[in-house]
């Protein structure tokens, strides 16, 4: 399932509704951990953020594997891939309402790589696009947390147009 919201309370409510105590959760854009703190401590949590203020706050959460890097970079994806090759939940909150193009690219690549059961995205631009678009006559629907019709085509190196990604991603 893929859920989209902008309101942070709705985003966290969607997470609480779907998360299970034993889930592997990859959180992209954890900032200082306000959403991370709402997750059960029994989850396997990998949280990533490149903001300077994130490190100090995330160090307080000993049960979280925090990575202070940019989620747009291949090296960051590779680092997480070495920790886990799949996840139950992919959480994406990169700036809340800005850069829907970047958020979608990050979603596409990370979800194609880790094949989450659920993806929850917080982004105003994507939500506005979704709420404004029509396309009901074509039946492309994913029941998982990734775009099922694309299967593995979002995994580097298969995305040739993204120069940030390399072909060194191997199991």
Write out the residue ranges for each language-model feature.
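Conserved SAM-binding loop
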Residues: 58-59
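C-terminal substrate-binding/active-site "lid" region of AdoMet-derived donor-dependent transferases
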Residues: 96-171
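Short amphipathic alpha-helix with an adjacent loop that forms part of the alpha/beta core around
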Residues: 74-85
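S-adenosyl-L-methionine
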Residues: 1-21
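Conserved SAM-binding strand-loop segment of SAM-dependent methyltransferases
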Residues: 63-73
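Glycine-rich SAM-binding Motif I of class I
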Residues: 33-37
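Conserved class I S-adenosyl-L-methionine
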Residues: 22-31
């Amino acid at each position: 399932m893929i859920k989209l919201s902008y309101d942070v309370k709705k985003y966290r409510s969607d997470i609480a509704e779907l998360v299970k105590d034993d889930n592997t959760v990859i959180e992209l854009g954890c900032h200082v951990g306000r959403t991370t703190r709402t997750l059960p401590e029994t989850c396997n949590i990998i949280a990533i953020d490149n903001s300077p203020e994130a490190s100090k706050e995330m160090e307080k959460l000993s049960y979280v594997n925090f990575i202070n890097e940019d989620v747009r970079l291949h090296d960051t994806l590779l680092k997480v891939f070495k920790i886990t090759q799949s996840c139950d939940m992919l959480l994406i909150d990169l700036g809340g309402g800005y850069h829907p193009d970047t958020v979608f690219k990050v979603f596409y690549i990370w979800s194609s790589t880790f094949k989450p059961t659920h993806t929850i995205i917080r982004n105003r631009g994507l939500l506005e696009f979704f709420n404004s678009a029509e396309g009901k006559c074509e039946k492309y629907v994913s029941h998982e947390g990734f775009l099922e019709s694309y299967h593995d085509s979002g995994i580097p190196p298969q995305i040739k147009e993204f120069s940030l990604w390399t072909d060194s991603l191997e199991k």
